[in-house]
């Protein structure tokens, strides 16, 4: 059945900001789908609030709305654009929930919009836990196996407590309906835990419903990815097995494709159940993902859940098999059937052929517990990882070791040196699933644990345990051999050992091992991911390395540019860097180069097989990159390697690559050092005559104390060379300085600690610019809403700046040019300034693409990353202006007066983390970056743009109700006017005694509320935290002070997170919110597409 002719335009809903559980994989699937639909001649309308995505680029859809993904805003877009259909299955849970609520409240019917890709009945059957139970029972009646875990549905805490007895006692699993990434779920071992987990679950579920289930801890966990069309063709795209048993969320588990430990009969059984379920649920134009548990003792199969949409696993399955699930789902949604869709990779086979794999894929999660030191690091059914790396090998051991190496984290690879630990202690530690459990298991094996002991402690399948023993045996052979011969090195390489690991075991430097290996002629070959185990020829070069026989890299004539990606997402280095890499690939391809992408992150657009001419799915380590450069140099000429776009990961390789004779283009490694190294950068500033805050470098506590005494407190303390502000802190007195140095840093002459004067009350400014060696193009000037001292990645900012004048911009332009010239930048540079009093201080400069590049590009309608890639390879700004890649005149510092105002807001993952006592993690922002993603609000005035950014990040600002205010003494004066505005808008104020007193003296009424530390009053008056928990507060303003009032504030802020009440922690944010509330109350908040904004800007420029 060919494409439907009754659909001319489609609205696609994206997934919004990157949060834990819903990350870059939805940008990847959404981008693919928009392209396919556009190629089919449909008008594509997209809504997504996340500016760091490729899908929100103006060329991907016909009309792109960077607006909050809420039913109210989506309705405005539908009213304006009048699409025929709505496709909600590509934007994760956010899109699905929004679509369902718009179906339920009649908006879709009112405007005659049809849901495609999944019908409401199918979505409900898949997502509603009770209905899904019915589906599984119906399947069991038909085919005789597959069942659900025993469970009860609860709508109140009383139901929950009673439910435990029905199931036969603890432990029980709590799962809320319609949430994602396991939000609000967990294992409860006693009543206290149950009350806490179920309480949060009832709050998070949009239907206030949780399911209690019997515990299946320790069972084996599997997933199947399936697709079905309306002719009832079903394909099983991929089977995935979790290395960790049940009890760890699949997003936090190491996973393997294809499944390794299923017998053929068990696999056929899972297939039968899966196919029966997709039919019973009624998914008939798209894909779904089904999770199973198998009891290792008797083979009982339990169906855990299904997602009737494109999911995190489908991105992994697409990258693992080369079968583009999202692309095919989009085609099915507009009426095609599987047998009509050709396979892009072979061009011979249709999509109804199931992919076959002649390799093994391993995904390993990347965590960020170091950012939340108080959080409980146990892995549970709530997802906590922030990113993932994927590796491909010819066998499991090779893929596993490559995946662990790809995580780029200290201690992520297996270590076979160092003292052997105590077996009993290590086994006891391995019982609790944590981030590095696989390494603990390896240490236990080193300490003499047997396979049975490891299985009893961890319940990890004996086959996997056996593979770990095999890796350990190879390490022992390496250690005991008299000399390193060719056979031994080749064997170690086939099991995934890196040169560094071999060197560690033999007591040699990594480069020495590499020399020996090359002298013996042992190098990897590159194999193709072809979907068909080499039965048909593959047309797309998508490679992985292996120590095998023949290489499949074809010769080429065009000069190649190798772009190094950013590896697994983490806090501080996310999708924004991937965005710049993808843009570089597009721009250089247009300019006649062959583009080669190197990356190992399965969630991203950069690792899509049609983003670049060639893709290497490999770890970003020096060894792996050098081998790729070698393989490509045999294939044809290399124009250079780009390291400045992928964040800190490739930047850290630049000097070593250059030392190995690799041509690094753009900013030179020496220039990178001049900006990153404190001393060298200080000299650049001195030559340009620019002030920086007073600072010093200390290698002992005595030195640090002396510097702090001279500069004066508060001071900012941090280790040198860091991304995302790791380990920074604002220190107010000497005792805290002493504890910071003893607790948190390895301090030594080679690893000094930097002590800076902390600029209180300064305005922080971010600048993105391009420099070609002679001319500067100012990309954009962003003014931060929060004051200096909050990491720029966590602060909201506005572009164009809202309070800076023409004179300030002139100074910023001159300073930026001075620094770019002094450092020697070719391409992008990002500089952070602080304006304190009348002095413009330089805080830091990064000679690379920054995380604000996508935001700046969208806000000013100029593709900065594309321009940067061209400049790295020799183009000048003047040439790019003539070509039309940059505006003919003016730049981001001279935007027209009526340019729209864009506000970027950071999104935090607070609700995911709890400490071991189950308390939340404090939400106060500081100099260490903790956000996982961002949203953008764009409108003609600041108030509305800010209100949109808040709605996109945390849910809409309240326009009336009760506001609670409690601020530090230093903020009391500046809080009076915004507080008076809130009253004018009809808010009722509540405040703690100190704040209420100041308000009253200024003629503002506020009800006094008890602090948490004062406890409940004699007549049962509630404390503020009780008011929040009881849902009696709509807005919270709470600024932290010192360390005394810290605890009260902490209780208030964590309660706000648990109940999802907007909580502002700075007076600046309150002032912005008041402008936003004002804009909302005066109604008429409209929506405009990026294309309309861009037309307006371009017209004003000419």
From Swiss-Prot:
CDD domains documented for this protein: MGS_CPS_II (cd01424)
Domain MGS-like residue range list: 955-1100
Residues that coordinate or bind Mn(2+) 1: 291, 305
Cofactor dependence: Mg(2+); Mn(2+)
Record keywords, A-Z: Amino-acid biosynthesis, Arginine biosynthesis, ATP-binding, Ligase, Magnesium, Manganese, Metal-binding, Nucleotide-binding, Pyrimidine biosynthesis, Repeat
Role played: Large subunit of the glutamine-dependent carbamoyl phosphate synthetase (CPSase). CPSase catalyzes the formation of carbamoyl phosphate from the ammonia moiety of glutamine, carbonate, and phosphate donated by ATP, constituting the first step of 2 biosynthetic pathways, one leading to arginine and/or urea and the other to pyrimidine nucleotides.
Domain commentary: The large subunit is composed of 2 ATP-grasp domains that are involved in binding the 2 ATP molecules needed for carbamoyl phosphate synthesis. The N-terminal ATP-grasp domain (referred to as the carboxyphosphate synthetic component) catalyzes the ATP-dependent phosphorylation of hydrogencarbonate to carboxyphosphate and the subsequent nucleophilic attack by ammonia to form a carbamate intermediate.
Species assigned in the record: Streptomyces griseus subsp. griseus (strain JCM 4626 / CBS 651.72 / NBRC 13350 / KCC S-0626 / ISP 5235)
Record-listed ATP 2 binding positions: 718, 757, 759, 764, 789-792, 832, 844
Catalysed reactions, semicolon-separated: hydrogencarbonate + L-glutamine + 2 ATP + H2O = carbamoyl phosphate + L-glutamate + 2 ADP + phosphate + 2 H(+)
Protein origin, superkingdom: Bacteria
Segments for region (Carbamoyl phosphate synthetic domain): 552-954
Binding locations of Mg(2+) 1: 291, 305
Cofactor: how and how many bound: Binds 4 Mg(2+) or Mn(2+) ions per subunit.
EC main group: ligase
Coiled-coil ranges per UniProt: none
Annotated positions binding ATP 1: 129, 175, 181-182, 214, 216, 221, 247-249, 291, 305
Family the entry assigns: Belongs to the CarB family.
KW Ligase (keyword) present: yes
Residues the entry annotates as binding Mg(2+) 3: 832, 844
Name used for this protein in its record: Carbamoyl phosphate synthase large chain
Subunit structure: Composed of two chains; the small (or glutamine) chain promotes the hydrolysis of glutamine to ammonia, which is used by the large (or ammonia) chain to synthesize carbamoyl phosphate. Tetramer of heterodimers (alpha,beta)4.
Transmembrane stretches, start-end: none
């Amino acid at each position: 059945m060919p494409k439907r002719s009754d659909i001319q335009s489609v609205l696609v809903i994206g997934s919004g900001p990157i949060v834990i559980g819903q990350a870059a994989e939805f940008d990847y699937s959404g981008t693919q789908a928009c392209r396919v639909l556009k190629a089919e001649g449909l008008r594509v309308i997209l809504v997504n609030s996340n500016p760091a995505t490729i899908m929100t680029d103006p060329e991907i859809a016909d009309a792109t709305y960077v607006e909050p993904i809420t039913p109210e805003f989506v309705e405005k877009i539908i009213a304006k654009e009048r699409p025929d259909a709505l496709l909600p299955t590509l934007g994760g849970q956010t899109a699905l929930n929004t679509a369902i609520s718009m179906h339920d409240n009649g908006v879709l019917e009112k405007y005659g919009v049809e849901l495609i890709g999944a019908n409401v009945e199918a979505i409900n059957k898949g997502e509603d836990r009770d209905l899904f139970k019915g589906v599984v029972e119906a399947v069991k009646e038909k085919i005789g196996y597959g069942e659900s875990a025993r469970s009860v549905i609860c709508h109140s805490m009383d139901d929950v407590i009673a439910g435990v007895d029905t199931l036969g006692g603890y432990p029980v699993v709590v799962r809320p309906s319609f949430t994602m990434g396991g939000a609000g779920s967990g294992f409860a071992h006693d009543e206290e835990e149950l009350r806490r987990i179920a309480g949060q679950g009832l709050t998070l579920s949009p239907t206030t419903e949780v399911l209690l289930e019997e515990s299946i801890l320790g069972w084996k966990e599997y997933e199947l990815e399936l697709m079905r069309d309306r002719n009832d063709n079903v394909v099983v795209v991929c089977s995935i097995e979790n290395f960790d048993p049940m009890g760890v969320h699949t997003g936090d588990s190491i996973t393997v494709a294809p499944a390794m430990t299923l017998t053929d009969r068990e696999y056929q059984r899972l297939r039968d159940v899966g196919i029966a379920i997709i039919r019973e649920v009624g998914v008939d134009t798209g894909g779904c993902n089904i999770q199973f548990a198998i009891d290792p003792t008797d083979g009982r199969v339990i169906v855990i859940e299904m997602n009737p949409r494109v999911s995190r696993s489908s991105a992994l399955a697409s990258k693992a098999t080369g079968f583009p699930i999202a692309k095919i789902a989009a085609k099915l949604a507009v009426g095609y059937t599987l047998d009509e869709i050709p396979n892009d990779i072979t061009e011979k086979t249709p999509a109804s052929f199931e992919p076959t794999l002649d390799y093994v894929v391993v995904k390993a999660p990347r965590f960020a517990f170091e950012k939340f030191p108080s959080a409980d690091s146990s892995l549970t059914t709530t997802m906590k990882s922030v990113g993932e790396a994927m590796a491909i090998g010819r066998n499991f051991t090779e893929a596993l070791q490559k995946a662990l190496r790809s995580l780029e984290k200290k201690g992520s690879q297996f270590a076979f040196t160092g003292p052997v630990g105590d077996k009993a202690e290590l086994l006891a530690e391995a019982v609790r699933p944590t981030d590095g459990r696989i390494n603990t298991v390896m240490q236990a094996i080193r300490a003499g644990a047997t396979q049975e002991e490891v299985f009893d402690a961890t319940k990890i399948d004996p086959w996997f345990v056996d593979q770990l023993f095999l890796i350990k045996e190879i390490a022992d052979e390496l250690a005991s051999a008299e000399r390193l011969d060719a056979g031994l090195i080749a064997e170690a390489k086939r099991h995934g050992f890196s040169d560094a690991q071999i060197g560690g075991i033999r007591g040699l430097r990594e480069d020495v091992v590499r020399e020996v290996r090359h002298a013996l002629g042992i190098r990897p070959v590159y194999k193709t991911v072809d979907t068909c185990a080499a039965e048909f020829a593959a047309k797309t070069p998508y490679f992985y390395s292996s120590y095998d026989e023949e290489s499949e890299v074809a010769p080429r004539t065009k000069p190649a540019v190798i772009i190094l990606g950013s590896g697994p997402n983490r806090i501080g280095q996310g999708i924004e860097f991937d965005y710049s890499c993808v843009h570089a690939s597009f721009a250089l391809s247009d300019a006649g180069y062959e583009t080669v992408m190197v990356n190992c992150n399965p969630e991203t657009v950069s690792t899509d097989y049609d983003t670049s001419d060639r893709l290497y799915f490999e770890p970003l380590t020096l060894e792996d990159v050098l081998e790729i450069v070698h393989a490509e140099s045999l294939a044809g000429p290399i124009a250079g390697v780009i390291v400045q776009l992928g964040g800190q990961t490739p930047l850290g390789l630049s000097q070593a690559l250059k030392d190995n004779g690799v041509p690094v283009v753009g900013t030179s490694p020496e220039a990178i050092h001049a900006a990153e190294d404190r001393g060298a950068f200080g000299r650049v500033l001195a030559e340009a005559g620019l002030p920086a805050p007073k600072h010093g470098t200390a290698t002992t506590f005595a030195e640090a104390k002396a510097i702090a005494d001279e500069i004066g407190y508060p001071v900012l303390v941090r280790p040198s060379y860091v991304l995302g502000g790791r380990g920074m802190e604002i220190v107010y007195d000497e005792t805290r300085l002493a504890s910071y140095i003893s607790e948190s840093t390895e301090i030594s002459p080679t690893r000094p600690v930097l002590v800076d004067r902390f600029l209180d009350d300064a305005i922080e400014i971010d600048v993105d610019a391009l420099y070609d060696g002679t001319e500067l193009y100012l990309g954009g000037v962003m003014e931060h809403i929060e004051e200096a001292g909050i990491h720029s990645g966590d602060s909201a900012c506005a572009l164009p700046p809202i309070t800076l004048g023409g004179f300030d911009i002139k100074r910023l332009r001159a300073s930026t040019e001075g620094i770019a010239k002094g450092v020697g930048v070719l391409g992008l540079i990002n500089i952070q300034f602080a304006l304190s009093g009348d002095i413009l201080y330089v805080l830091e400069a990064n000679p690379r693409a920054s995380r604000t590049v996508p935001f700046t590009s969208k806000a000013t309608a100029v593709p900065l990353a594309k321009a940067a890639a061209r400049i790295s390879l020799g183009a000048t700004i003047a040439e790019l202006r003539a070509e039309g890649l940059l505006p003919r005149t003016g730049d981001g510092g001279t935007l027209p007066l009526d340019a729209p105002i864009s506000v970027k807001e950071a999104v935090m993952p607070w609700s995911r983390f709890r400490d071991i006592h189950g308390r939340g993690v404090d939400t106060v922002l500081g100099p260490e970056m903790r956000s996982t993603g961002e949203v953008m609000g764009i409108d003609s005035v600041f108030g509305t743009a800010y209100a949109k950014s808040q709605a996109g990040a945390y849910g809409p600002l309240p326009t009336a109700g009760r506001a609670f205010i409690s601020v530090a003494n230093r903020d009391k004066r500046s809080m009076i006017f915004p507080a008076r505005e809130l009253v004018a808008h009809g808010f009722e104020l509540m405040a703690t005694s100190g704040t209420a007193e100041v308000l009253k003296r200024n003629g503002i009424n506020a009800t006094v509320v008890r602090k948490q530390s004062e406890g409940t009053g004699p007549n049962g008056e509630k404390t503020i935290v009780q008011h929040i928990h009881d849902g009696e507060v709509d807005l919270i303003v709470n600024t932290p002070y010192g360390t005394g009032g810290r605890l009260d504030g902490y209780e208030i802020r964590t309660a706000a997170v648990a109940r999802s009440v907007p909580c502002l922690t700075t007076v600046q944010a309150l002032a912005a919110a008041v402008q936003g509330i004002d804009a909302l109350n005066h109604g008429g908040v409209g929506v405009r597409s990026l294309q309309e904004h861009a037309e307006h800007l371009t017209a004003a420029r000419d």
